[in-house]
Regions:
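Amphipathic alpha-helical assembly/interaction segments
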Residues: 1-127
């Protein structure tokens, strides 16, 4: 995975995914780990970091358009999973409404950019 500062700064999708993963890690550090919370914490950290990792890999131009689209489609599934974990965390009162709203908005923004990127890749493939 190529993730140097220049690559991140030039890619809004990657920047936002790194920021989301970092914020979720910071949030999870504040939640008391126990037999119930630990699996939830583990899953949301895994899914949000997978979004970032797959966007990073999909952003590398040495891969084919098919491979890049595949990586972005994985990221799309992982962002959906991240949103589901956030919803569960809010419902179980592990996070406050304002934190849920902020992180959900970030997820939605990333989701929209992923849809747009996939649409562009598919359009250029058929050209």
């Amino acid at each position: 995975m190529v993730c140097n500062k220049e690559v991140i700064q030039g890619n809004q999708l990657l920047e936002q995914s790194v920021e989301l993963a970092a914020q979720i890690i910071e949030l999870c550090r504040t939640i008391k780990p126990d037999v119930i919370n630990s699996p939830i914490i583990s899953q949301i950290v895994r899914s949000s970091s997978s979004v970032m990792a797959n966007i990073s890999e999909g952003s590398v131009s040495i891969f084919s358009q098919k491979e890049r689209a595949y990586r972005f489609s994985i990221s799309l599934r992982e962002i959906e999973e991240t949103m589901s974990w956030l919803l569960l965390m809010k419902r179980c009162m592990l996070i406050k409404q304002d934190i849920f709203a902020k992180l959900s908005e970030q997820c939605l923004s990333i989701k929209k950019m992923l849809f747009s990127s996939l649409k562009t890749l598919k359009a250029s493939k058929s050209s």
